Amino acid sequence: LRAADVVLDGVVVGRDAVIGGVEEGGAILDAALDYGAVLLCAEALGAMQTLFDMTLEYLKTRQQFGAPIGKFQALQHRMADMAIHLEQARSMALLAALALARSAGGAGSDSANADRDASAKTRRRVVSAVKYRVGLAARFIGQGAIQLHGGMGVTDELPASHYFKRLSMIELTLGDMDHHLERFMAQPGFREAA
């Protein structure tokens, strides 16, 4: 899906405006996209936590058959599954932040450059694993929250619908789950470990 075409005609960029060296643009862009993906995962984590909390409160207050619907075991099981997905996503988001911190080393000796290259490969693998896992959790928690809210879950009056829409957009931004799964599997070491 293209939203726009950008055409640069007659643009001259001076040497002082170049970021990085020759043939380094891809690595810089790759790192920037990874940072963006991790920030989106952090945003998704906040949205999932909010949806979880809203849904839990709704189950405590919504009455059916003379009791809060949160007393029904089937709904308790669904909330437990949502809590598991939420905590897995939280752990993965922390892992991604750690991978970014480790790959953020500066320039230096050849050994430092080799370490940075290895860190970049690890960063790519970790970020893709995290974006995939957070996407799964966002879909599970978002859909679960909407379903547990019943018909109210899809109305604009209830904030849950807006959080669900945002989670759906986050999953598609900077590479969807399929893209990140393919990227993860393409990393060196994946086939040998499998």
Each model region followed by its residue ranges:
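Flexible, small-/acidic-enriched active-site or ligand-binding loops
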Residues: 1-21
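Alpha-helical interface subdomain recognition
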Residues: 22, 31-194
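Short, acidic (Asp/Glu-rich) active-site segment that either coordinates a divalent metal cofactor
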Residues: 28
